[in-house]
Amino acid sequence: MGQRISSLPRRSLAFLRALKRNNRREWFQPRKEQFDADVREPLLAIVERLADDLRSIAPEIVVDPKTAMYRIYRDTRFSENKTPYKTHVAAVFPWRGLAKHEGAGLYFHVSPDEVWMGGGMYSPQTAQLQAVREHIAGNVRRMRAIVESPGFRRHVGELEGERLQRVPHGFPKDHAAAEYLKYRQFLAGRELPPAFACNPKFYSTLITVFRQVAPLARFLNEPLVNR
C-alpha cells in the first residue's frame, strides 16, 4: 500500500459494520489481528500519506501518524454506554503549539453510517472561546472572506456548530460579526456516504476539503497561539 493508497479497502468497512453488530470483547479479541490488517493498517497508510501533503497546505499542522489516529477502545468509566469499542475510526491533526484537543485542527472519520472530513474548533474552553470571539469581532472581514469564499462554499458548504440564540454578552447586538459571534463551535466539513471511504477519489477529496478548512483553522488559532 505505502504512501500511494487513495482509499480504504472494502474489507475495512465490512469489519466496522460487523463490529457495530457485535460490539463485545469476546467477539473482537479473537479478531484483533484482522482489525489491524483490515482497518488500522490501511488507515495508517492514509495518515502517513497525509503527513507529506499537509505540509504544503498548512505547515503549522502536526502530523504524527502514531498520535493522529484514535484508539478503537472506548473509555467507558463515566459513560452509561458500556460497549467497549468505537464503531468508527478517526484521525485528528492539531495545530503546532496547541494540545491535541485544544484550538482548531483538521479531522476525518469513517463509520458504518457516514464519512466525515473537515475540521474546526469542537469544544473550546470558556477563555479560548472568548479570545476567538474577540478575534472575530476585530477581523470580521477576514472571517467572512474565508467562510464565504467560492472554494469553501463549493467543497465544504457553510460554517456549522452549536450556536447561541443571541449575541453573547459584551458584544453589540448589531455587531458586523453578530452571526459568527453566536457560535460556540466552529465546524466546517463534508459528510459523505460510508462507501465513499472505498472510492478511489476518497484521498483527493480529503485533500481538497482540508485545503479549504485549513485557513479557517489557522484564523481561529491565531489568538490562541499568540497568547
Label each region the model flagged.
Residues 1-30, 187, 200, 223-227:
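Short, charged, low-complexity amphipathic alpha-helix
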Residues 4-10, 45, 52, 210-214, ...:
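Polybasic/polar functional segments that serve as interface/processing modules
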Residues 59, 63-95, 99, 145-163:
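Soluble extramembrane domains of integral membrane proteins
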Residues 112-171:
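Compact, glycine/acidic-enriched structural inserts
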Residues 189-227:
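C-terminal edge-of-domain segments
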